[in-house]
A protein has these predicted regions:
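N-terminal glycine-rich anion-binding loops that anchor highly charged ligand groups
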Residues: 26-40
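Charged, compositionally biased N-terminal leader segments and the immediate start
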Residues: 1-29
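Short glycine/serine/threonine-rich phosphate/pyrophosphate-binding segments
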Residues: 78-81, 138-143, 164-168, 191-195
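Feature captures the catalytic cores and cofactor-binding loops of soluble hydro-lyases/lyases
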Residues: 125, 139-157, 166-169
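A short, well-structured juxtamembrane/interface segment
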Residues: 49-64
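C-terminal functional extensions of proteins
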Residues: 165-208
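Buried hydrophobic positions in well-ordered alpha/beta secondary-structure cores of metabolic enzymes
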Residues: 74, 157-159, 198
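Long, charge-dense
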Residues: 87-125
Length: 208
């Protein structure tokens, strides 16, 4: 009976399989590790085509993390999936305001979503932030409105909400306006796991 594979061996083998299955598809070298990390997380090769990067987005995200920026997520799941040990070693932390009672109360009073209010709360943070949005398109819409009003300047927007209502439009708005560097999963696919995977792909390039 052969010995069970170690986690690192499993990951290395998985990435080798991904590379093999991608075949002769050409990925931009600066984006390749992000794309493969997302495929590794989802087993979905569509992301090789649907992930859209603004020029130098990966380099800008890595530079921001090296500078000690924080990460803001729209779900506790995304927050849980991000490698906080590496992030903390760089001087950053992860924030998610979605579950804060005062955010829920304000959203109810104003008749807007908690995601919308949570982005307003995040805009008050006193340091650069990467915004990793994997669930709520209204978070992206809120971010776009805040950027238009010069109330927030994201170091990077990871726009990968999943679903059917406002999802595609919110992503395209981030791409079309191009007010901040972005990594966006075009179409309906995405999710908190994808948002966390992209954050980790950037962090692992710093600590590999």
């Amino acid at each position: 009976m052969s010995e069970p594979m170690k986690p690192m061996e499993i990951e290395q083998r998985s990435f080798a399989i991904i590379t093999e299955l991608l075949g002769d598809r050409v990925l931009a070298p600066e984006n390749e590790l992000v794309i493969k990390r997302v495929i590794h997380t989802t087993a979905d090769f569509d992301y090789a085509d649907t992930l859209s990067f603004s020029p130098h987005a990966v380099q800008q995200g890595i530079a921001a993390l090296k500078g000690g920026c924080d990460i803001v997520t729209d779900t506790q799941m995304a927050k849980a999936g991000i490698n906080k040990t590496i992030l903390a070693s760089l001087g950053g932390e992860v924030h998610c305001f979605m579950s804060d009672p005062d955010v829920a109360q304000e959203a109810k009073t104003r008749g807007v979503t908690r995601a919308f209010v949570s982005m307003e709360r995040a805009a008050m943070l006193q340091k650069p932030c990467i915004f990793a949005i994997g669930n709520a398109p209204t978070a992206l819409l809120s971010l776009e409105a805040l950027m238009e009003e010069n109330k927030v300047a994201p170091a990077l927007i990871i726009g990968v909400p999943v679903g059917f209502v406002n999802v595609e439009a919110s992503k395209e708005q981030i791409i079309d306006a191009a007010r901040a560097p972005y990594i966006v999963a075009r179409g309906r696919k995405g999710g908190s796991n994808v948002a966390a995977a992209i954050c980790n792909a950037l962090l692992y390039q710093i600590r590999r």
